[in-house]
From Swiss-Prot:
Gene Ontology cellular component terms for the protein in this record: chloroplast; ribonucleoprotein complex; ribosome
GO molecular function: rRNA binding; structural constituent of ribosome
Gene expressing this chain: rps8
Name of the protein described by the UniProt record: Small ribosomal subunit protein uS8c
Species the sequence originates in: Ostreococcus tauri
Compartment list: Plastid, Chloroplast
Length: 122
């Protein structure tokens, strides 16, 4: 049983990229689905496919170099909109959990809201 589903998601994606897979399965939780949708909108992942047996499949796109978990269950990291810095000079994206849902750091800065910094992808 996995306690940290976000770390599990990032590890599955990282391993699939390193193994040159075209798709991988992720645990179907609300947070993981929301993060995957943000990554699809930002162009880091391809379309999300059908959910089955508690898992859903995502198609991978080439070009992703790194996945980094920022806020962990033991050490939560929060930032307001002024503290959110661009990832890799705007080439990457930070995924933020805000009061208005899960979104990118760019969108959170534009809306002037902060939240928990879940992960960074570049």
């Amino acid at each position: 049983m996995v306690n940290d589903t976000i770390s599990d998601m990032l590890t599955r994606l990282r391993n699939a990229y390193l193994a040159d897979k075209e798709q991988t399965s992720l645990k179907a939780t609300r947070v993981v689905k929301d993060i995957a949708q943000v990554l699809v909108q930002e162009g880091f992942l391809g379309p999300i496919e059908q959910e089955e047996n508690g898992f859903f499949t995502v198609n991978l796109k080439r070009g992703v170099k790194q996945f980094e978990r920022v806020s962990t269950p033991g050490v939560r990291v929060y930032a307001n909109h002024k503290q959110l810095q661009p990832v890799l000079n705007g080439m990457g994206v930070a995924v933020i959990s805000t009061s208005q849902g899960i979104m990118t750091d760019r969108k959170a800065r534009a809306l002037g809201i902060g939240g928990e910094v879940l992960c960074k992808i570049w």
